């Protein structure tokens, strides 16, 4: 594999020599950093099983190597890497897999270790959505996830990825993560804090990642991380699990942050060792039981993961003074909800008791029941999934609801050819050789729902959202 030239500040190299265990080779570290990163994907088990995915993609000649800590994760090699971007494959467009770096699958593996089955989870720094979607798959779309993102520009990307993967149990917020400890104390069974960091572990992906690196900036970042983990720990219920992770390598932003939390709340913090998380985990194990993953150990990005339990309650933070504002939605009455459910079922949309109908003007939404306890405590950017808009003749079903709720076995499902599916993703109407009978048509490809069309004569009118429309070469190879 070709090498690339990585910029290493001298002070960084000195710090790494001190931080690296004697069992590891510093020369191996430097060599690993200069090898391009292996690509990896995670199968979205909300949409397909690993076995079915492997069978579906077998004709492509992809080499898929299992990732030890994530049974649905694979390193991927393709002979035609330059011919078609992974993101333009049919399987990616329909949400069957997520392009995710292997080491970033570790925190969620740690969150659900030992059979942990949390019902209300927070992802404090969620964009672009790799870990939120991984959490949702582990929860099988049950319970509720609060996915927060501080950067306004990244919230849209977060929602797009959640929607593409067919996820229905997520509420999005846009806050500084330091507010949650005061705003929603002891409300979560599990919390993932994949903290903003100096990014020392990502040099294999970005050779210039350390251009602005300095020991002083590490200390400033660590100060913010301490505030974030303190807030997250307050938001965690007693008995709950907190996973703290970064994609950096210095101890200041990793072990020291976790040790600070234990020193601050000595009777409430229990470190949960990760040496048995997967075969070979002990190669990265620290004396505290954390995983400090240098890139040469597993040939992946540098990463850090710690898992801890909150053993008892801690003194509450001052109640926040901000006002959340009026919640603009109201629950739909049972009788009307039954009518809506029946109408939705006629086009193949079904949901279970984990979701409840709410209304805002002419909009119908499905919110995860587990998030209702947070209403009035935080302001949501987006909650659950938009099911439909009402109009004089009935309902205008929404694309994200189709992707999350539709069954491809519905009587009105219509399977597209590869060429027709590609036209669909380009936002164009489809003219099948034999048009379906129904007026509302659930269009599928590879037996996966990809949208809802109106039949007008022999034409299927495209309803694919404009912001998702794709240009350029797609999976049939035609531009």
From Swiss-Prot:
It catalyses: cytidine(1407) in 16S rRNA + S-adenosyl-L-methionine = 5-methylcytidine(1407) in 16S rRNA + S-adenosyl-L-homocysteine + H(+). SUPFAM superfamilies: S-adenosyl-L-methionine-dependent methyltransferases. GO terms for cellular component: cytoplasm. PROSITE patterns: NOL1_NOP2_SUN, SAM_MT_RSMB_NOP. Its main location: cytoplasm. Keywords: Cytoplasm, Methyltransferase, RNA-binding, rRNA processing, S-adenosyl-L-methionine, Transferase. It is found in: Cytoplasm. Gene3D superfamilies: 3.10.450.720, Vaccinia Virus protein VP39 (3.40.50.150). Transmembrane segments: none annotated. Its EC number is 2.1.1.178. It holds the Pfam family Methyltr_RsmB-F. S-adenosyl-L-methionine binds at residues 125-131, 149, 176, 194. InterPro entries: Methyltr_RsmF_N, MeTrfase_RsmB-F_NOP2_cat, MeTrfase_RsmB-F_NOP2_dom, Nol1_Nop2_Fmu_2, Nop2p, RCMT, rRNA_ssu_MeTfrase_F, RsmB/NOL1/NOP2-like_CS. GO terms for biological process: rRNA base methylation. CDD domains: AdoMet_MTases (cd02440). It comes from the Bacteria. The active site is at 247 (nucleophile). GO terms for molecular function: RNA binding; rRNA (cytosine-C5-)-methyltransferase activity. Belongs to the class I-like SAM-binding methyltransferase superfamily. RsmB/NOP family. PANTHER family: 28S RRNA (CYTOSINE(4447)-C(5))-METHYLTRANSFERASE-RELATED (PTHR22807:SF30), NOP2 YEAST -RELATED NOL1/NOP2/FMU SUN DOMAIN-CONTAINING (PTHR22807). Specifically methylates the cytosine at position 1407 (m5C1407) of 16S rRNA. This is Ribosomal RNA small subunit methyltransferase F. It comes from Escherichia coli O81 (strain ED1a). The lineage of its organism: Bacteria, Pseudomonadati, Pseudomonadota, Gammaproteobacteria, Enterobacterales. The gene is rsmF.
């Amino acid at each position: 594999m070709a090498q690339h030239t990585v910029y290493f500040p001298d002070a960084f190299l000195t710090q790494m020599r001190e931080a690296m265990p004697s069992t590891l080779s510093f020369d191996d570290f430097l060599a690993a950093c200069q090898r391009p990163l292996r690509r990896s994907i995670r199968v979205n088990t909300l949409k397909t099983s690993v076995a079915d995915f492997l069978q579906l993609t077998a004709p492509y000649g992809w080499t898929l190597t299992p990732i030890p800590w994530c049974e649905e994760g694979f390193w991927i090699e393709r002979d035609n890497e330059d011919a078609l971007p992974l993101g333009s494959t049919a399987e990616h467009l329909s949400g069957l897999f997520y392009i995710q770096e292997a080491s970033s699958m570790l925190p969620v593996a740690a969150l659900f270790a030992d059979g942990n089955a949390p019902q209300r989870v927070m992802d404090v720094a969620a964009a672009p959505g790799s870990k939120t979607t991984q959490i949702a798959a582990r929860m099988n779309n049950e319970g509720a996830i609060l996915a927060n993102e501080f950067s306004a520009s990244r919230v849209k990307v977060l929602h797009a990825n959640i929607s593409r993967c067919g996820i229905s149990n997520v509420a999005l917020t846009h806050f500084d993560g330091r507010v949650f400890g005061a705003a929603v104390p002891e409300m979560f069974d599990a919390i993932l804090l994949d903290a903003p960091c100096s990014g020392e572990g990502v040099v294999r992906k970005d050779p210039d990642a350390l251009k602005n690196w300095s020991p002083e900036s590490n200390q400033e970042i660590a100060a913010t991380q301490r505030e974030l983990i303190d807030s997250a720990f307050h938001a965690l219920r007693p008995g709950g699990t907190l996973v703290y992770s970064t994609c950096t390598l210095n101890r200041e932003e990793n072990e020291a942050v976790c040790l600070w939390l234990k020193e601050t709340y000595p009777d409430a913090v229990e470190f949960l060792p990760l040496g048995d998380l997967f075969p070979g985990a002990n190669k990265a194990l620290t004396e505290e039981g954390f995983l400090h993953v240098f890139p040469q150990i597993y040939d992946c990005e540098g990463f850090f993961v710690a898992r801890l339990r909150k053993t008892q309650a801690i003194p509450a933070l001052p109640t926040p003074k901000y006002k959340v504002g009026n919640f603009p939605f109201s629950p739909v009455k049972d009788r009307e909800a039954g009518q809506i459910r029946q109408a939705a079922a006629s086009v193949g949309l079904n949901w279970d008791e984990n979701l409840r109908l709410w209304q805002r003007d002419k909009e119908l939404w499905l919110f995860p029941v587990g998030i209702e306890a947070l209403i009035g405590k935080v302001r949501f950017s987006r909650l659950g999934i938009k099911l439909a808009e009402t109009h004089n003749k009935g309902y205008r079903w929404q694309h994200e609801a189709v992707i999350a709720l539709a069954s491809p076995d519905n009587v009105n499902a219509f399977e597209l050819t590869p060429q027709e599916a590609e036209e669909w993703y380009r936002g164009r109407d489809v003219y099948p050789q034999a048009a379906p009978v129904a007026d509302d048509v659930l269009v599928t490809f590879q037996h996966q729902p990809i949208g809802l069309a109106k039949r007008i004569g022999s034409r299927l009118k495209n309803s694919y959202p404009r912001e998702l429309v794709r240009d350029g070469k797609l999976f049939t190879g035609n531009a």
